[in-house]
Amino acid sequence: MAKEKIVLAYSGGLDTSVAIQWLVESGYEVIACCLDVGEGKNLDFIKEKAITVGASESYTIDAKEEFAEDFALIALQAHAYYEGKYPLISALSRPLIAKKLVEVARQEGASAIAHGCTGKGNDQVRFEVAIHALAPDLKVVSPVRDWKWSREEEINYAKEHDIPVPIDLDNPFSIDQNLWGRSNECGVLENPWTTPPEAAYDLTVSLEDAPDTADIVEITFDAGIPISLNGENMSLANLILTLNEIAGKHGVGRIDHIENRLVGIKSREVYECPAAVTLITAHKELEDLTFVREVAHFKPIIEQKISETIYNGLWFSPLTEALVAFLKSTQKFVNGTIRVKLFKGHAIVEGRKSPNSLYDENLATYTSSDTFDQDAAVGFIKLWGLPTKVNAEVNSKVTITTEV
């Protein structure tokens, strides 16, 4: 009798390597699936390792471009910062991974999908809600959450089954990375009073080690999409990765954040997102130049909601679809170039230009070239201030008594 097939989100690390053997012992035929979303994984090595550990098949997928164009771009155009700080690094990759897991499951005729998340993080929610949204008939299994082993028990299990134990297992941090940034938690970071050690960082340098000379970059957007960096056209994924290097060497994008997790606890997270911070800063500046006032004032409401919705694992939901539709409708005239100075942890906008700019220098100037009709201000002020004046006239006639 054929075994039930299960597709495992495989990273090549200890947890998911042990999960392969555990699932095999549980009676499954395991198909491993690993995505590269910009963290620079050695996909060939991971593919071979999955087979060595016990998977019957191993898929490795380079998904950098899809991640950049269909997921990171939404976060960029939404200026997405959960709680005003976190640019949704891991939260963005989970729905894409879930989508690919479902595609592989359909191709292989699998009846279940497994992931390597623990029972106290947000990712278990994101994976399972996304999978159920895309394939409600598929069962979801969480080995790490189910077996409840200590780290020592997990290592012993690996050794007993000849599963390679990673040489960096003593790394005190839990790290997740994609092209939109790098997240870091656990170890000494669990004490919110402790200063993050430099060992916690990889994409950025400290302010002390940042160069004393700034880099100036010019980012060109077409309909809200970054299309070139310093005059060189490149794919969105390559542009983000290139900007990670340039902005990272200036210490741009370090974030130390106490975060309210979806599962109800607070966690201390350290993020590095040099490209994300730089691009969001530039994109916001271009919107300020090209948006009418009413859209500029309303869009932040949508931005906050879409940030929360994505963080909470609802990427594949009617609400997210509606929010993204509004977002896309605002980007038609977000065209132009922004000049940004990268220096000592800062991304500072120093220049902006756009064929769709609503800034009129002749209206803004106080020189003799001024074309603003100042006489029109008198009537405008009378009408604008009329409700305030009427309120004052009416209520000034009311005697207010205060009892002591």
UniProtKB/Swiss-Prot annotation:
Its main location: cytoplasm. It catalyses: L-citrulline + L-aspartate + ATP = 2-(N(omega)-L-arginino)succinate + AMP + diphosphate + H(+). Transmembrane segments: none annotated. GO terms for cellular component: cytoplasm. GO terms for molecular function: argininosuccinate synthase activity; ATP binding. It is found in: Cytoplasm. It comes from the Bacteria. L-aspartate binds at T118, N122, D123. Pathway: Amino-acid biosynthesis; L-arginine biosynthesis; L-arginine from L-ornithine and carbamoyl phosphate: step 2/3. The keyword Ligase applies. Its EC number is 6.3.4.5. Keywords: Amino-acid biosynthesis, Arginine biosynthesis, ATP-binding, Cytoplasm, Ligase, Nucleotide-binding. One of its GO terms (biological process) is argininosuccinate metabolic process. SUPFAM superfamilies: Adenine nucleotide alpha hydrolases-like, Argininosuccinate synthetase, C-terminal domain. L-citrulline binds at Y86, N122, R126, S174, S183, E259, Y271. ATP binds at A9, Y10, S11, G12, G13, L14, D15, T16, S17, G116. Belongs to the argininosuccinate synthase family. Type 1 subfamily. Homotetramer. This is Argininosuccinate synthase. It comes from Listeria monocytogenes serovar 1/2a (strain ATCC BAA-679 / EGD-e).
